Amino acid sequence: MRPGQIIVLATPVFFLLIGIEFLVGRRRAKLGTGHDTYRLPDTINSLGLGILSQISAVLTGLLRIGLYTACWSAFALFPNEHFWTQWHGWLLALVFYDLCYYWLHRFGHESAVLWAAHVVHHQSQHYNLSTALRQTSSGALLGWIFYLPMAIAGVPPLVFGVVALVDLLYQFWVHTEQVGRLGWFDRWFCSPSNHRVHHAVNDRYIDRNYGGVLIVWDRLFGTFKEEDEPCVYGTRSPLRSWDPIWANAEVYWALARDSWRTRRWSDKLRVWIKPPGWRPADVAAIDPKPAFDIRQVQRYEPQASGSVRAFAAAQFALLLAGAIAFLWFSDTLPLATSLVWLAALTAGLWATGAALQGRLTVAEVLFIDAAALATASGALGIGQLHGVFKPLALAVLIGFALTRHRAPEVPGRFARLLIAGLVASLAGDVLLMWPQFFVPGLVCFLLAHLAYIGLFAQGVGLFPRPNALAATLGIGAVMYAFLWWGGLPGGLRIPVGLYVVVIACMAAQAIGRAAVAGDRASLKVAVGASFFMLSDSLLATNRFVLTLPVASLWVLATYYAAQWLIAAHVRPAGEAAADQLPNMSPSR
């Protein structure tokens, strides 16, 4: 049985214990003897990051085990499997693993690039059992290095995998505020009290108590601290987001930005290996960060209505079911199939977080769900599922647009053009599901682009930036020549040529509108129009020139991104833009 399947079997136990902890906290809060440590958005975010970590481990886990096995095969000094599979061998391997884990964990707090991976586990400002499941998706990229001593010593890969899972599962129960000090146990083992210290941002607790199972490593190496004052949780640079993708990327992005901006070549490297918080002097001078003050710490709790919270909980439950099914069968799936479902589940988790932040409406989340399922089913050839979700995605987006633009201040022509473009696209989606209706489908999308040209011309006129028109027509001409020489049938050369001209004009109109308006919303619409060109280019290449791997994945992903960027961000002419782009002209 694989680790992923063991995690699946352990999931009901995890949720049972989370439920018990939640009820205990609520009761203690009512009695005045404790407090409730759970907030629904934070819990969904932590559990969602746990799901993302597990489903991505289907890919990254191969790296970790593969490199370990290769090293063991080549360099093992004592590869006696009989010894290592006796009780004393298992125990020695577990202690050995825990020692290696201590140093990985410690360097994860003392080296910025390793902190970039580990920070995910510390971002929650609450401390409960859901925090235990909040794990990184990038830790395996470098973490395997710290376990190579086990491979060289001769610990077999199977034994390594089992003790790694035991060490990980042990750490689940220590993430709670509902269990106090445990006397002698605290002196030898990682316990709730010891691990609360590790998660705290108090000055006296920073970079302490790294042990996974045994706390004696911290006592031996001088990093132990007892819990002697209330803990404040989170990180000193709070995430302030429910976005699981950004949670994994935020520190990498900050390091890359500082590395890019510093002028000294040595600092471009040092920023990655120095302790977290270290910054090149020249970067810190132009972009200083305020000193941490624990008295200023505020919990991130954006307002979300009860209905949105209920929807997010239901959405998460469905994503959890999908992730469980994926983990159970992942060992039998081809790599491409795993990548497709990983992308679909990630899209759903991202959309759930965005809804809880108020960045997406429920309708937009439903569109993303339908689009993800349409894309996945199309890429994997699941015809019946694709036949349902491909038209459903655009139908949901039409409903969203009707609701968003029905206000009296929205001009009727603006709304009609947007809806016309979406309805024509829906008709094209349906027709293109049958190869014999390619030309009628092409005509529907041509009409959609004409509607979008009229929509984007509102308030700015036709083609306000001739250079943009020249560029998109040039790109279209190159693509058309590529199709022509690649085998475009003679009967399709005129309709496809006409379509290329119209979609290029649509993209040029969107780009020109963005240049005139100068706001982020119009820029997103322009990106959407460009995605439309990319999607259709991929579709035509796959149909007429050469077969692309999992073509439907790339075609539909860019197509749905295009439609959402247009429908969600296009604005009537004259509407005030609160997200005006900064003026990039030089100042005097």
Give residue spans per PLM region.
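Transmembrane alpha-helix boundary signature
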Residues: L59-P79, Y102-E110, L380-G383, T403-G412, ...
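Alpha-helical transmembrane segments of multi-pass membrane proteins
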Residues: L16-R27, A57, A372-L380
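Polytopic alpha-helical membrane-helix bundles and their juxtamembrane interface segments
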Residues: L360-R588
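Membrane-interface helix-loop junction between the first two transmembrane segments
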Residues: G19-I44, V388
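Alpha-helical bilayer-embedded segments of polytopic membrane proteins, i.e.
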Residues: P3-E21, D42-G66, G89-D98, S137-L168, ...
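Membrane-embedded catalytic scaffold of the fatty acid hydroxylase/desaturase
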Residues: I51-L63, F83-R240
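Transmembrane alpha-helical segments that form the membrane-embedded catalytic/substrate-channel core
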Residues: F15-V24, V95-E110, L165-G180, S191-V197, ...
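Cytosolic/stromal cytosol-facing helical appendages immediately following the last transmembrane segment
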Residues: H126, E177-Q315
